[in-house]
Amino acid sequence: MEYVFFDIECACVYKNVAKICVFGYCVCDEQFHILKKEDILINPNGKFHLTDRGGEGIVLPYDYDEFKKYPDFKAFYPKIKQLLEGEDKLVFGHAAINDVKYLCLETRRYKLPSFTFRFADTQILYMAMTETYDRQAGLEALTQIFEIDYTPHCAADDAYATMRIAQEMCGRDKCTLPELLKKYSIRFGKIENYQFNNSSSNRRNEYLREKSREKRERGEKRARFNDFVYGYRVRPQSQELRGKRFSFSRSIEEEFALAKRLVKEIVKRGGKYSLKLSGCNAFVEREGDDSVRRNAAYKMRDEGKITDIYTLGEFERLYATQENDE
């Protein structure tokens, strides 16, 4: 069994176009002994568009004029196909779905038969191992964690770094790579007939389903609160808060009974509630809140757009009557 790690660099990438200029790979045996490592330079038949006008973006460690000397993707298609396909090999990439998409787009561009192979993703494997499903671990970040030297965006080096990351993960769990995939319930991705699906892990899928459910529930809670604010119209009993337009932390808005009671107290005292942070001049935060909305409120205070920020406890002591939040 051979392990094939690969990485692709493109001259440009758009929604339905990816002009491959480098196919890098590193082939090793089951003990991670390197059998071959190579950069295949490819004429992309197009210009390089990797940076914006300000020079921001990717700079490949190659002389771009050199690519014109090489054949285009069609010439290297048989070799790449032979590298990736076959029952005697396991194929890996880091954020591999992007590279698989590039292969699919290029076969369509040159009217070549689709690739057919399965692949696993070291990024997804690492997230499953560390249970860090809320953020994607980039290749460069993992090379720092595992202390691996490599040249970023040199495709063969990226493939080598991906191999070394897989080797380090196997070393930490003291098992083979197939055993590691099984241990963390990694499902292979696949490309066939110009269609492809990503590698995945059962644990990450469960996490994403739970996050989706939580997001949906938060949205429903906020919608209920929004409807209340839009429809609540009563005559103020005093002008104590006249001119004050309040907004709350999202976590307060999502606790409907509490938020409803606080809004009633604001309106009763002549104030108003703004569903948009940009429309308020006073903000109520829950203790310990470090959300984007809360941080934006503090920035607005520094800019003079918000005059008062209260913790929930402070606000309730000053203005809110204590009732059962039902």
PLM region spans:
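Acidic, Mg2+-coordinating catalytic module of metal-dependent nucleases/exonucleases
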Residues: 87-97, 101-106, 133, 137-205
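Active-site-proximal helix-loop-helix substrate-binding element of RNase H-like nuclease domains
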Residues: 42-60, 64-67, 122-160
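DNA strand-break repair and replication-stress modules
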Residues: 184-326
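Short, glycine/charged-enriched secondary-structure capping and boundary segments
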Residues: 18-21, 105-109, 262, 298-300
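A mobile, often basic/glycine-rich helix-loop segment
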Residues: 108-114, 118
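Short polybasic/polar patches that bind polyanions
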Residues: 105-108, 127, 144, 267
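Short, solvent-exposed loop/turn segments at secondary-structure junctions
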Residues: 96-99, 125, 253
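Conserved non-catalytic scaffold segment of RNase H-like nuclease domains
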Residues: 2-104, 116, 144, 295
